[in-house]
Each structure stands twice: as C-alpha cells, then as structure tokens.
A protein has these predicted regions:
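Generic protein-terminus/edge-of-domain signal
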Residues: 1-61, 65-68
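Conserved hydrophobic/aromatic beta-strand scaffold that supports enzyme active sites
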Residues: 29, 50, 74-76, 98-100
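Residues immediately flanking
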Residues: 55, 79, 101-103
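Short acidic-glycine-tyrosine-enriched beta hairpin
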Residues: 64-78
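A hydrophobic/aromatic-rich effector-binding and dimerization subdomain
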Residues: 88-153
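Hydrophobic/aromatic residues within well-ordered alpha-helical segments
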Residues: 135, 165-166
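All-alpha amphipathic helical-bundle segments outside canonical DNA-binding/catalytic cores
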Residues: 152-165
Length: 166
C-alpha cells in the first residue's frame, strides 16, 4: 500500500472520485471502465465495497499480497478496509465493477441482520473469491438490477429491494 491512501468516507464521495453520478446517497454501482482513477490507486473505503474484477493480467494489492485476476474475482471489503487497485505498471483496472453501500442502507433489513454471517467480508487480506463465468454473469445481472432500481425515484421500497439484490 502506498503512502498516499485516499480515504473515501461516503458513497457520494466515492462517486465523485470515480467520475460517477450519485443516484442514491447510500449505494452505487460503478463501472470501472468509465471511472476516472488516474490520480489515485490506493483507497480506504468507509462503507461496504464489493469489487468484481473482470480484467485480464491485472493485479490488486490487498493487505500484503497481490492477486492475479485472470478470469474474474470478487473482493468484499468492510467499512474501514484499504485496497490498492493497480497492476504491475501502476495503472488502475480498466474493466470491472464496484458496488459501494453504506451500512445505513442495510440497517433493519435481513442483510443487515445477517451480514456478519457472510464470511467473505471477513476474509484475510490474502484471500479473495474467484468466480466462474456463470457466477460472474449472475453478479452482473444483480448489479444491473440494482442499477435499474437506482434509476427510479427513491421511495419507501428502495432500501428493501436493493438490499435483497445485494
């Protein structure tokens, strides 16, 4: 991890840093192929972050390890964790997705009550979830459903619907 870690405390701040529009203050789906990550590669997120890497021959550093994501890999970070998103050329990924969601989004939902049971959020820094092509397709479909819900006006059902997709 480099000396200059960008601390991102909110979903809105994350959107601003990555050149995305904020559609909901507590959740965002960010397409890394459209993100502007030229000025930073090391991040500390103040919210849950799920990173789906679709890049070939790129690596991320999480903890003290680098990961080679040749087929598709999922990293799940809890609020306060850091990640270095760069490959061997010190450039950021060009393909993948970030699902960023604040703990307040899942408060009072089944996901909020059970998130500690999802062990992939408590993996050691040298662990990650490698996903099959079919698993990646399912994840992308769910991200698309979240994005579709975000395109609608926020209402009393948004939180429950989005948390079910997560």
């Amino acid at each position: 991890m480099g000396d200059k870690v960008l601390k991102i405390g909110s979903v809105h701040q994350c959107n601003c840093c990555m050149g995305s529009k904020t559609l909901h203050p507590l959740v965002s789906v960010i397409d890394l192929s459209k993100a502007d990550l030229s000025s930073h590669t090391d991040f500390k997120f103040g919210f849950y972050t799920i990173l789906l890497s679709e890049c070939k021959c790129e690596a991320y550093r999480y903890g003290h390890q680098y990961y080679d994501f040749s087929d598709g890999t999922l990293l799940c970070l809890t609020p306060g964790e850091s990640i270095s998103m760069k490959d061997s050329d010190n450039t950021c990924p060009s393909k993948g997705w970030i699902l960023a969601f604040h703990p307040d989004l899942i408060c009072g939902t089944a996901l909020g009550a059970n998130i500690r049971d999802y062990t992939f959020f408590s993996y050691r820094p040298e662990e990650a979830l490698h996903v099959s092509l079919r698993e990646k397709q399912v994840i992308l479909e769910l991200l698309d459903k979240i994005n579709q819900e975000l395109q609608r006006c926020i209402d009393c059902y948004s939180q429950k619907i989005i948390s079910k997709y997560i």
